[in-house]
């Protein structure tokens, strides 16, 4: 049986209490909801494991050198370190939970990566079938099936006996399970925790006419999910599948050369996953940068995002990544070229238009609807100089697109590891995203009359829907 730590500090005399190992920050748990959330979360976790020097297929400690490397990179933020129990090889436990009503996605990942998810069933919560693309059904079944069948708090405690610093939560917003379960979970965390836990959500808006969603019900699902994010999420980051797909297609040749969690799935199960490989790789890169901004040795904490966004309207951010796709030999021992991990390399990517906003936003909306209080947060991982000249260069990049004042720009410098390429992710908070969301809200309002009985039998009344709709319209107007 794998042992557990009862506090964030290792026991006296244990192998982990080395003078060279810093006191790690409190853990962060990734909870992935629905088919989309599980795929994106698994890809992000693979990236994070590489970040801290662990094998993404089988994270273990074999030697004291392995231990030092992972600890110095704050691997305990995303990995649970069990005590030794006889074997020379100690599995490192990902602090990740895969949750879905349909058991297929979570079980496929679990079966395909038995050496990654060492706690087996403790990494998975699933029901007996999907939520029929119905947010109200998913919310009701979260209570009836998930809370009744599983003690969710015990599952979280198994992944992190230590006090939890925060939760990162990827999911799709247009479907039934991901949208509703993410909503219910963040409500559960915020109403059942006495600790100041920070919740960060990563919601993917569907591409209508491409993704397998039902247009009318999806707009209702998105509105209700957005309302819950407004109420319970401290840092809400939005992606557009349309933009992710376009960027993945544009960078198809590069993506083919980048290893992915999907590469190791059984060939007969690639349908439904392979088409999203590039999209997940692009989004996962920005989520990993978000986590690195507070998991590595920086002057920034996860809770700072709460303070940044709490007074904003809308209190949402969209990611801008430079580059869209990392170098092909990322985390390799020999990084190609001399500029790939410097600011000079970053600016070259911008010049070649190898950067990209990951949200479907119109240039006219940026000019017409951007607000005077728009702001942004630069997450910067580069080697070498990052002083006045480098900051001014990034400011100019942003000002070419958004009217953001210098005083409303935040810079977070992230330590870069050996073998890592440079990376800049800019989280942009702007009123210019309002028109896209308000368009969806308008469609949801028109669709409600036809769907009110179907949603009503699962507990979503017209009064509750209209209140949610009004809250979302107010937030994004």
What would you call each of these model-derived segments?
Residues 2-477:
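Terminal, contiguous helix-loop blocks that mediate binding/assembly
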């Amino acid at each position: 049986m794998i042992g557990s730590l009862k506090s964030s500090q290792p026991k006296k005399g244990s192998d982990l209490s080395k003078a060279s190992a810093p006191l790690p920050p409190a853990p962060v748990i990734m909870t992935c909801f629905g088919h989309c959330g599980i795929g994106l979360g698994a890809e992000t976790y693979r990236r994070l494991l590489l970040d801290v020097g662990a094998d993404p297929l089988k994270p273990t400690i074999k030697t004291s050198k392995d231990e030092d490397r992972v600890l110095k990179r704050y691997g305990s933020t995303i990995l649970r370190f069990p005590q030794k129990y006889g074997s020379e090889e100690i599995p490192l436990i990902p602090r990740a939970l895969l949750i879905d009503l349909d058991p297929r996605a979570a079980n496929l990942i679990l079966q395909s990566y038995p050496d990654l998810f060492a706690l087996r069933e403790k990494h998975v919560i699933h029901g007996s079938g999907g939520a029929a693309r119905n947010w109200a059904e998913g919310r009701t079944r979260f209570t009836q099936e998930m809370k009744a069948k599983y003690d969710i708090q015990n599952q979280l405690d198994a992944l992190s006996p230590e006090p939890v610093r925060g939760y990162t939560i990827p999911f799709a917003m247009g479907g039934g399970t991901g949208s509703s379960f993410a909503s219910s979970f963040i409500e559960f965390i915020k109403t059942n925790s006495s600790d100041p836990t920070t919740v960060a959500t990563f919601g993917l808006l569907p591409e209508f006419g491409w993704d397998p969603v039902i247009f009318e019900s999806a707009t209702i699902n998105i509105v209700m999910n957005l309302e819950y994010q407004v109420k319970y999420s401290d840092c809400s980051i939005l992606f557009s599948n349309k933009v992710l797909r376009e960027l993945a297609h544009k960078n198809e040749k590069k993506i083919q050369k980048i290893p992915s969690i999907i590469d190791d799935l059984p060939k007969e199960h690639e349908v439904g996953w392979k088409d999203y490989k590039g999209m997940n790789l692009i989004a996962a890169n920005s989520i990993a940068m978000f986590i690195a901004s507070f998991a590595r040795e920086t002057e920034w904490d996860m809770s700072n995002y709460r303070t940044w966004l709490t007074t904003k309207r809308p209190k949402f951010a969209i990611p801008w990544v430079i580059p869209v796709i990392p170098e092909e030999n990322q985390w390799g021992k020999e990084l190609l070229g001399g500029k790939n991990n410097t600011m000079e390399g970053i600016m070259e990517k911008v010049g070649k238009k190898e950067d990209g906003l990951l949200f479907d936003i119109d240039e006219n909306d940026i000019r017409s609807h951007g607000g005077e209080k728009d702001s942004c947060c630069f997450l910067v991982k580069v080697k070498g100089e990052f002083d006045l000249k480098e900051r001014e260069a990034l400011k100019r990049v942003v000002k070419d697109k958004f009217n953001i004042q210098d005083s409303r720009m935040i810079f977070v410098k992230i330590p870069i590891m050996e073998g890592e390429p440079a990376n800049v992710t800019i989280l942009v908070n702007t009123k210019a995203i309002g028109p896209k969301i308000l368009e969806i809200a308008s469609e949801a309002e028109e669709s409600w009359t036809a769907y009110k009985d179907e949603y009503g039998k699962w507990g979503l009344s017209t009064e509750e829907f209209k209140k949610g709709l009004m809250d979302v319209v107010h937030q994004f107007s």
